[in-house]
Amino acid sequence: MEVPGPLRAASGGAARVSVPAKTLRGVLEELERRYPALHRSICDETGKVRPHVNLFVNQQHMRDREGLDTALGPGDVVIILPAVSGG
């Protein structure tokens, strides 16, 4: 999983973390155990992905695949992309 700069403090400074899981949902469950602060940055208290956070699997948005049930295989890359806004 690729972790963007603004969220790296929540992953112990790591730009990439290896998370063994068979689905995107499994990745988030493992993140909750290993990196709870990173999980809270991605998901709300109900476990849903926050509206301003986009998750991609191999450069394809999860909503264009199977959502959190998107299957993952060896070598797949999950990218976290939080929305940026300003005024």
Cite the ranges covered by each PLM segment.
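Ubiquitin-like/PB1-type beta-grasp interaction modules and other compact soluble beta-rich domains
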Residues: 1-86
